[in-house]
């Protein structure tokens, strides 16, 4: 809600004069996790000699849960409360696709505007991977970075040969989307334009995610819809998770789509700065590129010093890259084989 409020303030939108029936919300969000103490009473009711008895949950476990537990943690709450805050009575939707949520929500918001269902959309995403329960899940299931001989601020090392995994982050980012003519007519400050977005999910029949193929599908379709070729792209804001295999899969996907230019197109990985904020990362990374391009630069990747021969990418590091090319690609992918890509142009 705070990010949406700041976006509306920055947009200088006259809220008293707009048609609120034509203002909508499309927001990506992680699954919301309650803290362990919220669930503990119900879980203890089902304890049988130190083991959880699922058969007792319906009658005994639920009785230990607060009645409004589910409503407090539904991932549509961000879009709901943003809609209330802005009195946005147009289309309202929530997407929960882990790290692919932000780009997917923005793509859907653009489709709503282009089909005439709204004049403006508040599009964005929010996520936290530092919430206690989510941290526990990440520690159990994800490849988390840890170094005994380095400061924590250096642990996130996307595409670096010494990388050991991701670090947890949190955040939220909201954009006000509208047609260019609509924005110019009201004298809005324009940060950039979205040319296209695309998503792709590839999973084997046995449930194994094929993240490289998903990325290839999303990137290829986004470029095709934008009517641009790989050689037109000024930089890529990569997913850059920082885990060993995930970065290799992403690099391979870039090489597969970009061909000979894959080793030269500048690549930045903003998770080196903010960590993995889950659903929020797509919008935060788009904002980083757009704000950088306003100053004629692309943000650098932190903690990158040793190239990985398995990636072979032109990673921007050391200092921001000066550029006149405003066209760029940003991509995200989940551990479950869901990928999203977006082509944008800065100002």
Predicted regions and their residues:
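Glycine-/small-residue-rich "gating" segment that lines the acyl/pantetheine channel
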Residues: 47-65, 107, 111, 115, ...
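Active-site nucleophile and cofactor-binding loops and adjacent substrate-binding regions
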Residues: 1, 18-20, 69-75, 94-102, ...
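A glycine- and small-aliphatic-rich helix-loop capping segment at beta-alpha/alpha-beta transitions
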Residues: 34-51, 113-115, 135-148, 214, ...
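Flexible, low-complexity linker/loop segments at domain and module junctions
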Residues: 19-20, 226, 230-232, 263, ...
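Conserved beta-ketoacyl condensing-enzyme motif
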Residues: 1-86, 90-92, 127-135, 230-246
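Condensing-enzyme catalytic core mediating Claisen C-C bond formation in acyl metabolism
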Residues: 149-228, 234-235, 347
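Acyl-CoA/ACP chain-elongation machinery
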Residues: 117-164, 197-210, 240-248, 264-314
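Active-site-proximal alpha-helical scaffold in enzymes
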Residues: 1-13, 75-79, 83-86, 92-127, ...
């Amino acid at each position: 809600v705070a990010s949406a409020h700041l976006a509306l303030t920055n947009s200088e939108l006259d809220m008293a004069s707009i048609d609120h029936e034509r203002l909508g919300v499309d927001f990506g969000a992680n699954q919301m996790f309650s803290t362990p103490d919220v669930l503990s009473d119900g879980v203890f009711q089902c304890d049988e000699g130190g083991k959880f008895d699922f058969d007792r949950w319906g009658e005994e476990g639920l009785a230990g849960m607060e009645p409004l537990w589910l409503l407090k943690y539904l991932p549509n709450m961000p879009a709901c409360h943003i809609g209330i805050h802005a009195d946005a009575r147009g289309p309202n939707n929530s997407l929960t696709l882990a790290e692919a949520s932000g780009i997917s929500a923005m793509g859907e918001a653009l489709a709503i505007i282009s089909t005439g269902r709204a004049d403006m959309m508040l599009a964005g995403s929010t996520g936290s991977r530092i919430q206690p329960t989510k941290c526990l899940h990440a520690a159990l299931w994800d490849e988390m970075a840890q170094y005994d001989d380095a400061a924590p601020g250096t642990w996130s090392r996307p595409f670096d040969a010494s990388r050991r995994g991701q670090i947890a982050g949190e955040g939220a980012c909201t954009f006000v989307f509208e047609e260019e003519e609509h924005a110019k007519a009201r004298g809005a400050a324009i940060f950039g334009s979205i040319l296209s977005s695309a998503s792709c999910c590839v999973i084997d029949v046995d449930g194994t995610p094929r993240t490289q193929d998903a990325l290839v599908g999303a990137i290829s379709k986004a470029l095709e819809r934008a009517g641009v070729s790989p050689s037109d792209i000024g930089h890529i804001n990569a997913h850059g998770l920082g885990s060993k295999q995930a970065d290799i899969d992403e690099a391979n996907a870039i090489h597969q789509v970009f061909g000979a230019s894959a080793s030269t197109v500048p690549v930045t990985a903003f998770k080196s700065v903010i960590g993995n904020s889950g659903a929020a990362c797509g919008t935060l990374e788009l904002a980083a590129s757009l704000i950088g391009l306003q100053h004629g630069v692309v943000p650098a990747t932190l903690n990158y010093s040793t190239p990985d021969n398995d990636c072979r990418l032109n990673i921007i590091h050391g200092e921001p890259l000066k550029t006149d090319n405003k066209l760029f690609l940003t991509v995200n992918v989940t551990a479950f084989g869901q990928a999203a890509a977006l082509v944008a142009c800065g100002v």
